[in-house]
Amino acid sequence: RPPGFDPFR
């Protein structure tokens, strides 16, 4: 997962 990526956001 790339930096700054939030799957739970």
From Swiss-Prot:
Main localization category: secreted
Which terms does the record give in the GO molecular function aspect? toxin activity
- Indicate where this protein resides in the cell: Secreted
GO CC terms: extracellular region
Which family does this protein fall into?
Answer: Belongs to the bradykinin-related peptide family.
Secreted among keywords: yes
UniProtKB keywords? Amphibian defense peptide, G-protein coupled receptor impairing toxin, Secreted, Toxin, Vasoactive, Vasodilator
Organism, per UniProt? Pelophylax ridibundus (Marsh frog)
Tissues expressing the protein: Expressed by the skin glands.
| Coiled coil regions, renumbered to chain | none
What protein am I looking at?
A: [Asp6]-bradykinin
Tell me which Gene Ontology terms the entry assigns under biological process.
Answer: defense response; vasodilation
* Free-text function comment from the UniProt entry: Induces relaxation of arterial smooth muscle, by targeting bradykinin receptors (BDKRB).
